[in-house]
């Protein structure tokens, strides 16, 4: 689910997705991108916080860390994530956090602070 949300952010132009496995694996160009001092939104799927660990290995910490299990997202083995839940968490937490890091318009900044995101920007993601 975290990967899908990162793709949505990238496709909407709200954030640029980067390969966290490459950062954790020490791929020079990806580590440089992570260390470039651009704001970083880390989307960790569960309490293991693998994204945070990969960033830490590169000497970087996220400006904003969202752990999807904090939003009642359960880890699924051998099954797809719940698309309805994904859209809901994306609209309520992920997109507002990304836009707040970018200095998004006032409505999105309020949404990030209250967790009450407008849904018009994510309607195309409902399946």
Locations of regions flagged by a protein language model:
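Iron-sulfur-associated redox domains of electron-transfer enzymes in respiratory
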Residues: 1-125
């Amino acid at each position: 689910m975290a990967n899908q949300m990162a793709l949505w952010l990238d496709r909407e132009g709200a954030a640029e997705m980067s390969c966290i496995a490459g950062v954790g694996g020490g791929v020079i160009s990806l580590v440089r991108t992570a260390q470039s001092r651009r704001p970083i939104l880390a989307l960790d799927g569960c309490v293991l916080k693998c994204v945070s660990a990969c960033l830490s290995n590169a000497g970087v910490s996220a400006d904003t860390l969202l752990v999807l299990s904090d939003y009642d997202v359960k880890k699924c083995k051998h099954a797809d994530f719940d698309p309805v839940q994904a859209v809901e968490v994306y609209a309520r937490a992920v997109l507002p956090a990304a836009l707040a890091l970018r200095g998004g318009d006032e409505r999105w900044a309020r949404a990030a602070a209250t967790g009450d995101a407008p849904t018009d920007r994510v309607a195309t993601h409902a399946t």
